[in-house]
């Protein structure tokens, strides 16, 4: 939200997991979409998850930008026909992903499911556990990890799950914040 406000971009937050009726949204009225994470699985039989995938496909047809983070990336993957599957062991905490250019990036993971490669997508990030990020068509990016977090958010997520996380220095997260800013600017400006 901070980046959008700095750019003069109006944002509207919908919480379909709490009953916000996204199935009633007109995709033609939406300039772009960011789909964030959550504790549910994209494989759960929930009406709002299905409606969100329809919205993602509709925005793609309109060439509108979509950024998916964690569950959001999995929603993009499933919306276009690839699989999301349970990992043998969840990825939780700070870890490293490797960009296709060979650069290493420290990121925060909090997921127990992984994505199959979406046919036609460009891999952006991977690690030894799974596909971690991709671009699809011109205006869609999915990231399995969280670049939007702060040290305080990481501590709160760990505490809420009764899985305390080691303290994280802001400097460790700064390169990820810069990558996120570049993605937002590419998609939404």
Report each predicted region and the residues it spans.
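Cysteine-nucleophile active-site neighborhood
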Residues: 35-100, 104
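Amide-donor transfer/coupling interface in amidating biosynthetic enzymes
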Residues: 98-189
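Short loop/edge segments at beta-strand edges and connector loops
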Residues: 15-18, 86, 109, 125
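Short amphipathic alpha-helical segments
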Residues: 1, 45-48, 80-81, 120-121, ...
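N-terminal beta1-alpha1 cap of cysteine-dependent amidohydrolase-like domains
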Residues: 1-64, 159-189
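Conserved beta-strand segments of alpha/beta enzyme cores
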Residues: 10-12, 83, 106, 122
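Short loop/helix-cap segments at secondary-structure boundaries that form the rim of catalytic
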Residues: 1, 23-28, 76-78, 116-119, ...
